[in-house]
Amino acid sequence: MTQQGAALQNYNNELVKCIEELCQKREELCRQIQEEEDEKQRLQNEVRQLTEKLARVNENLARKIASRNEFDRTIAETEAAYLKILESSQTLLSVLKREAGNLTKATAPDQKSSGGRDS
């Protein structure tokens, strides 16, 4: 019976040792789980902050693109109006030169009658 008692004591010691090892492994796993949950929370906060920042950047970008489009429209309209003014100025200059030429011809002395043959 002593042999059985010794075996039972040995089994009991091994069971206690295995239970202690399992408890240690569980505690280590709990520590790892807590670390990963902390990391998860930190990452979720970063994602939230980055998402908010991205939304602000997108809003600013949309406003700036709209402003740029307004600049483009204004510049295009101004350039078109300026080209019309330039064309009108060119036309006005041509008309003025032609009229000035006509006036010069109309007011010039008659060169045919005073060609110097009468002298």
From Swiss-Prot:
Its main location: nucleus. Signal peptide: none annotated. Changing C18S: Does not affect oligomer formation. This is Microtubule nucleation factor SSNA1. Belongs to the SSNA1 family. InterPro entries: SSNA1_fam (IPR033362). Keywords: Acetylation, Cell cycle, Cell division, Cell projection, Cilium, Coiled coil, Cytoplasm, Cytoskeleton, Flagellum, Neurogenesis, Nucleus. Residues 2-32 are annotated as: Important for localization to the centrosome. Residues 13-70 form a coiled coil. It comes from the Eukaryota. The modification N-acetylthreonine is found at T2. The keyword Hydrolase does not apply. One of its GO terms (molecular function) is identical protein binding. The keyword Ribonucleoprotein does not apply. Microtubule-binding protein which stabilizes dynamic microtubules by slowing growth and shrinkage at both plus and minus ends and serves as a sensor of microtubule damage, protecting microtubules from the microtubule-severing enzyme SPAST. Induces microtubule branching which is mediated by the formation of long SSNA1 fibrils which guide microtubule protofilaments to split apart from the mother microtubule and form daughter microtubules. Plays a role in axon outgrowth and branching. Required for cell division. Widely expressed. GO terms for cellular component: axon; axoneme; centriole; centrosome; ciliary basal body; cytosol; midbody; motile cilium. Self-associates to form fibrils. Also forms dimers as well as monomers. Interacts with SPAST. It is found in: Nucleus; Cytoplasm, Cytoskeleton, Microtubule organizing center, Centrosome; Cytoplasm, Cytoskeleton, Microtubule organizing center, Centrosome, Centriole; Midbody. It comes from Homo sapiens. GO terms for biological process: axon arborization; axon extension; axonogenesis; cell division; intraciliary transport; microtubule cytoskeleton organization; microtubule nucleation; receptor clustering.
